[in-house]
Amino acid sequence: MTGMRRLVTILCITLSAAATGAQDGGRKAIAYVQAPEMSSGLCVEKDTASAIDCAVKQCIEGGGTIEDCQVNATCSPGGFSVDILMMADGGPHWHQFSCGWQARELALKAAELACSNAKDNGLIECTAVQLIDEDGTVVEPPFN
């Protein structure tokens, strides 16, 4: 399970990094920082560094430590993003974050794909819990 999660995370970060060169002036970056089982931070800012700094501050303010608040994902431009809650049998949970999508429907499809083999990976829950647009507006389910 952990290997697949890391592979998907690396793939998402790699694909989002490839889009960096296509950044349009004025578009914002997004960063998601997570301290597993403690806290997280999500920020949309003018550039990636500012978004990361802001998200780390939020994570720490929420109870995470500087050591545990790790960057989960960044995208510039941010596009549409989705926060996916994953919970393993036995209770541990974490969030997978996918960003940089050109349309909200694509972000939701990314969540669907991430959860497509959830039971095979020992997950008892896998669901999109937030959809974020490029301006940082957060929408919670249902996403209709």
State where each predicted segment sits.
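Bacterial N-terminal signal peptides that target proteins for export
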Residues: 1-8
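N-terminal signal peptide c-region/cleavage motif recognized by signal peptidases
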Residues: 16-19
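Secreted/extracellular ectodomain signature
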Residues: 21-144
